[in-house]
Amino acid sequence: ELAARIVSAEPLAVSWVETRTDTEMKEFEALVQVTHDIIAEAFSSKVITPGKTTSEEVVWWLRQKVRDMGLDTWFHPTVDIQRDSEALKSHIEAFSNGYEETVIQPGDLLHCDFGVSYLGLNTDCQQHAYVPFPGEKQVPEFLSQAFASGNRVQDLFTDSFGYGLTGNSILRTALEKGRAEGLRPSI
């Protein structure tokens, strides 16, 4: 008869792990900023020389930079190269596959996944950077449009959040809304 009164403690455990103090949240915001600052330096001409630097060299620069700061990486970072090497009907398709060749070249779109650990807090940041051709002053229009579409998908996803909804239903709703707007959403 008492067995019917037993309930799972999982929600309590998850809530405990998710709970952060105001001080922890301030430290977390600072840690996120540090993470973005490290990525900005990694993607700068201080670290990358197009035609010479490899994506793996940038990965190891990230790891060393974090160690030099007395921090730890949360996971092994990645730096992927996405390259428009062919004339295609859709530039988006050209940038949808990574390449095994690792030397960073002008015209490449770089993507990193990088996280830092400090005081039991962990960041997980993904960021892109475009490597301009000599004399190029702006990102190509097709990349600007692709990022705007990606941001729209993010908005559709977060707009689909709601109390009591499952992750799968939120995902399904966001994907349906994206397709209805003529996007090719992938979450």
Model-found features: residue ranges?
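Active-site neighborhoods and metal-handling regions in enzymes and metal-associated proteins
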Residues: 1-187
